[in-house]
């Protein structure tokens, strides 16, 4: 929940990026406020997650593509963590992809 803003070596929630809504909420204003460039760190994270998440998809689900569960970290871990009732949520990649789509809708950048 804290990402890079944590000051403690033993952070609450391990200072993970919670991608089942918390991280996304930080970027909701990016396009509607005409600050598209502020989306770039999130897009970099999505690019990284596509790499680590492809291994996770293959190992856990014998699937092509990539998957991210509800949390990730600086190493872009994608597997389920913490309690099963919320950790087994393989929709993080889909939620993050909404930001890619919103960026395209607002900018019309076909090369993106």
Label every model-predicted segment.
Residues 1-112:
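Substrate-binding groove/exosite segments of carbohydrate-active enzymes
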